[in-house]
A protein has these predicted regions:
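Exposed, low-structure sequence patches enriched in small/polar residues
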Residues: 1-170
Length: 170
């Protein structure tokens, strides 16, 4: 749970800077975040093999975002916190590591990550009044590596590829 700040809850208007007015919102609700996590990990010593995977999901109700209203006549911006819903994200990963020879000196590893975020807030462009904005972000990553290890030397070669795509919707 996340409580709104006391200044956000007070029903007052701070116009000490006439071009940047801040209003409170006594109707703000607390934010609640729910998290869900699954995790699995296994290691087989005989084969020097490891497997790990996890999935996380998080959702926030009543997030707090500042809503801006622009006054064309005075040029003043009025900012007021508002509750907004729709913020959530999901993440997952998979890792596999194993020896590829019977002596166990050569190994390979793969680590894959996936993430999706849905972030909702208010956005004001070119002095306009705030509009609800949703940013949808997708991330995918892969790391591959191969290594050699003996009692006095360890050498690894690895490569990483990451993809990130974000889209905004007003």
């Amino acid at each position: 749970t996340s409580q709104p700040s006391m200044t956000d809850l007070l029903d007052i208007t701070d116009d000490s800077d006439p071009l940047n007015i801040k209003k409170g919102n006594p109707g703000l609700k607390p934010s609640f975040t729910n998290n869900f996590r699954l995790f699995y990990n296994n290691y087989i010593e005989k084969h020097q093999r490891a497997l790990m995977t996890f999935v996380n999901f998080s959702m926030t109700r009543n997030s707090i975002s500042d809503k801006v209203t622009y006054d064309d006549n005075t040029g003043a911006r009025t900012t007021q916190p508002e509750n907004i819903n729709g913020n959530w994200n999901a993440r997952g990963a998979f890792m596999f590591n194993t020896a590829i020879d019977s002596a166990g000196v050569w190994n390979i590893n793969t680590f894959t990550t996936l993430a999706y975020t849905n972030a909702v807030g208010y956005l004001s462009l070119d002095g306009a009044t705030s509009q609800k904005n949703t940013t949808k972000q997708t991330q995918v990553g892969e790391r591959l590596s191969m290594g050699y290890r003996n009692s006095w030397l360890e050498v690894n070669l690895n490569g990483t590829l990451n993809y990130n795509h974000a889209r905004n919707e007003l």
